[in-house]
Curated annotation (Swiss-Prot):
Keyword field: DNA-binding, Phosphoprotein, Transcription, Transcription regulation, Two-component regulatory system
Highest classification ranks of the organism: Bacteria, Bacillati, Actinomycetota, Actinomycetes, Mycobacteriales
Source species: Mycobacterium leprae (strain TN)
DNA-binding region: 99-198
Protein name, as recorded: Sensory transduction protein RegX3
The organism's place on the tree of life at top rank: Bacteria
Gene Ontology molecular-function annotations: phosphorelay response regulator activity; transcription cis-regulatory region binding
Record's function text: Member of the two-component regulatory system SenX3/RegX3.
Modification after translation, per record: Phosphorylated by SenX3.
Length: 198
């Protein structure tokens, strides 16, 4: 455990890590700057830790690419559960199979053939819905902000609002959820964005 940004980077360079818990409020160098430097060095999973409970801090952390966030004060049990979940996602990578097929819960997507099935039954998706679902499946279990989803699916030059995304999510839910009004797979994370649960 280190207590400032430069020391954190030096320790990472010296010893490496399987996962990093990164406090946004570090002396000497901001947590976001440390995160950017870590990303230059490695794709190690990062959980942002912050004393702030504001929505904007969570959004910034997730849009930077953090794997998860936890707000102080937190229990040891919560932190351990989050660490295990992030390591499980990163280590097993069970949402993607080497032959170009993605799987998450009841969903199966053959990216090359542009085929999607739910519980073994094929469904038809327009291109944007397919692209949206593909990105969600490649990040199964991870909170994705509206900004991340729009940039990835519609492009960084998109000038519309987030309603377009919400409409596409609603259409996707009507095709992949048993009860679209009460989704259990494509869920809303209030104030942040969406997450695909496996």
């Amino acid at each position: 455990m280190v207590t400032d940004g430069p020391a954190a980077l030096a320790e990472f360079d010296r010893s490496g890590a399987d996962i990093v818990l990164l406090d946004l409020m570090l002396p000497g160098m901001s947590g976001t700057d440390v995160y950017k430097q870590l990303r230059v060095r490695s794709s190690v999973p990062v959980i942002m830790v912050t004393a702030r409970d504001s929505e904007i801090d969570k959004v910034v952390g997730l849009e930077l690419g953090a794997d998860d966030y936890v707000t102080k004060p937190y229990s040891a049990r919560e932190l351990i559960a989050r660490i295990r979940a992030v390591l499980r996602r990163g280590g097993d990578d069970d949402s993607e199979i080497s032959d170009g097929v993605l799987e998450s819960g009841p969903l199966r997507m053959d990216v090359e053939r542009h085929v999607v099935s739910v519980n073994g039954y094929a469904i038809t998706l327009p291109l944007k819905e397919f692209d949206l679902l593909e990105y969600l499946m490649r990040n199964s279990g991870r909170v994705l902000t509206r900004g991340q989803l729009i940039d990835r699916v519609w492009g960084v030059d998109y000038v519309g609002d987030t309603k377009t995304l919400d409409v596409h999510v609603k259409r996707l839910r009507s095709k992949i959820e048993a009860d679209p009004a009460n989704p259990v797979h494509l869920v809303t994370v209030r104030g942040l964005g969406y997450k695909l649960e496996s």
